[in-house]
Amino acid sequence: MASENMTPQDYIGHHLNNLQLDLRTFSLVDPHNHTATFWTLNIDSMFFSVVLGLLFLAMFRSVAKKATSGVPGKFQTFIEMIIGFVHGSVKDMYHGKSKVIAPLALTVFVWVFLMNLMDLLPIDLLPYIGEHIFGLPALRVVPSADVNITLSMALGVFILIIFYSIKMKGVGGFVKELTMQPFNHWAFIPVNLILEGVSLLSKPVSLGLRLFGNMYAGELIFILIAGLLPWWSQWVLNVPWAIFHILIITLQAFIFMVLTIVYLSMASEEH
């Protein structure tokens, strides 16, 4: 679908569609004429998230192999600054003894940042290549603007919350925490279970939706600027918004990391 033949409404709708695979037939579907189901996979979001994850691993592995005790290079210094920043954040916010939290926090921060950073690419660049070179019906390049990706990451954090809660308190302690707080009486077990259950489930939901909402809104603004304004005036709004969006990209990655650390710290504490 050539963007020059679209109305502004078609242009916006086209850029909000994912490249989808029907898992029942293992064939690409036309997102304009297909309603997503449980068996529909957004393969563009999966592809870019995996590629960016591998990029993160490659960058840090390269620095680790070349690290020296002498004067570090600029890239090594930059990576060391990120590691030091994340390590300091974990040290301040996590009060447990697990050695996994710092590497996890580093992975979360850099991976989410790289996914968010895709939002700064020209809105038509990769979709144009996908359409005209590979014949793809649609392509979205910002994985964190896909609610499936953000909620999947939040689900991973939720599983870790349950794991650390049971590890530190035991199954009995975890169940007691859900049933005997905030009212420490057996008669209030149903009320406690509802209150604590909602509190527990709200953590991954809010974690995933917060990241999705902010990145989706940022992506939508770029699309609106490109779809509704003439090309010669787009730079007037695009450049200031892109500069401001750099702050949003970094802040959202930081918030996701901080909340992950805080939730796991809460799960590791005795009450």
From Swiss-Prot:
Keyword Cell inner membrane assigned to the entry: answer is yes
The answer to whether UniProt assigns keyword Transmembrane to this entry is yes
Quick one: a GO cellular component term? proton-transporting ATP synthase complex
| Organism encoding this protein | Klebsiella pneumoniae (strain 342)
The entry's protein name is: ATP synthase subunit a
- Membrane topology, from the record: Multi-pass membrane protein
Source domain of life? Bacteria
**What's in the keyword line of the UniProt record?**
ATP synthesis, Cell inner membrane, Cell membrane, CF(0), Hydrogen ion transport, Ion transport, Membrane, Transmembrane, Transmembrane helix, Transport
Assembly and oligomerization? F-type ATPases have 2 components, CF(1) - the catalytic core - and CF(0) - the membrane proton channel. CF(1) has five subunits: alpha(3), beta(3), gamma(1), delta(1), epsilon(1). CF(0) has three main subunits: a(1), b(2) and c(9-12). The alpha and beta chains form an alternating ring which encloses part of the gamma chain. CF(1) is attached to CF(0) by a central stalk formed by the gamma and epsilon chains, while a peripheral stalk is formed by the delta and b chains.
* A Pfam family that the UniProt record links to this protein: ATP-synt_A
Question: What does the entry give for GO biological process?
Answer: proton motive force-driven plasma membrane ATP synthesis
The terms under GO molecular function for this entry are:
proton-transporting ATP synthase activity, rotational mechanism
The gene it comes from is atpB
Which function does this protein serve? Key component of the proton channel; it plays a direct role in the translocation of protons across the membrane.
